[in-house]
Amino acid sequence: MKQRIEYFDLLKGIAIFLVVMGHVITMCIRGIDSAFIFKLIGQVHMPVFFFISGYLTYKDSFAAPALKKRFLQLIVPFFVVSALWIWYFPHSSLGSPISASVPDMYCSFWKDGYWFTLCLFMLFLVYWPLSAVLRRCCHLWQQLVAVVATYAVLLYAASLWSSETENFDIAGLGLLSWFFPIFIFGVFAKKYSAAWLKVTSSGTWLTVAAVLFPLALFTIVYPWDVPFLPEWTCIFSRPLLHVSVVIIAVAAVSPWSSREFAPVAGAEARPSIVARFFKYLGTESLSIYLLHYFFLFPLTPLQEPLKAIGLPFVPLAAIAAVVALCIVAVTLFVAHIIGRSPLLALLLLGKQVRK
């Protein structure tokens, strides 16, 4: 159990660092969203969070107390921090487009960056009744039918009340339908943990994932290059992309975690600085997500030089990583101070701190 939690923390730590790197590219430097590294980062980090959430959710009974805990952890800071962000943004010197008011933000598709906590809570709400149905299904095929039917309902609802192109989505249904499959995949990975272990340790499955990943990624981020594919095919390609990402990520990070955190000659483990760094980021991933926007700063003078050299992967990744490291450090410091106040910790970090 301990090792599993540690490799999940490593995965979350790497993923949240990629989140900040992506925002450095799109909000600090700006104007270079066509860079491949941005498109890559934008597709690989969030599936990890939703998979882990689904995996850890399977053991929950989802009675009212569990939902109350999720509400306090996710929805309270969603409303408070997003409102503060809308107020603060005009003073940030960032030039990225953002909603003019809090009501506009709540009606937008991406919620000005704060969509994740709302989407995750909505997934818990959907899973609550679905879990009761799954418990009553005696066979795997019956469970899959229930999951596919739920997915179809979410897709239909999203088609009626959500539009990324029009930047409209009051209830968050669009992103809910995007990430429902990988969340449920996490649930099934926990339920059938022995089979999941075989998948992540199998060279065959890793090869399949490595082949599917670039193909699915290409159809999602460069749809204009595959005009022969109907738009609706994304309801299949996106889940395939997310599952491929998770298989590759777990297959890579789990052995690393075992090496880093395994006891040495009967003594306590001595993980490297890198492993300890990403593990710590993983334990503070929600705090980093909620607060890091406030510490982004303009880097627009870098736009033209980077465009002039063709937006190369390595220099852009290096710049984004260095800036992200600084932003994460400041964010963690502020989160530590906020965490000393139980009220502020709840409102701004989603943490319930006992006095």
Q: Residues of each region from the PLM?
A:
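Alpha-helical transmembrane segments and terminal signal-anchor/GPI-anchor hydrophobic tails
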Residues: L197-K279, L302, G310-L316, A320
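Aromatic-anchored segments of alpha-helical transmembrane domains
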Residues: F17-V24, V81-W87, V148-S162, V208-P223, ...
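Hydrophobic residues within membrane-embedded alpha-helical segments of Major Facilitator Superfamily
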Residues: L18, V48-F50, A189, L212, ...
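Interfacial loop-to-helix transition and helix-capping segments at the boundaries
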Residues: S34-M46, D104-C119, L160-I182, F218-V245
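Membrane-cytosol interface segments of multi-pass membrane proteins
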Residues: M1-V153, K307-K355
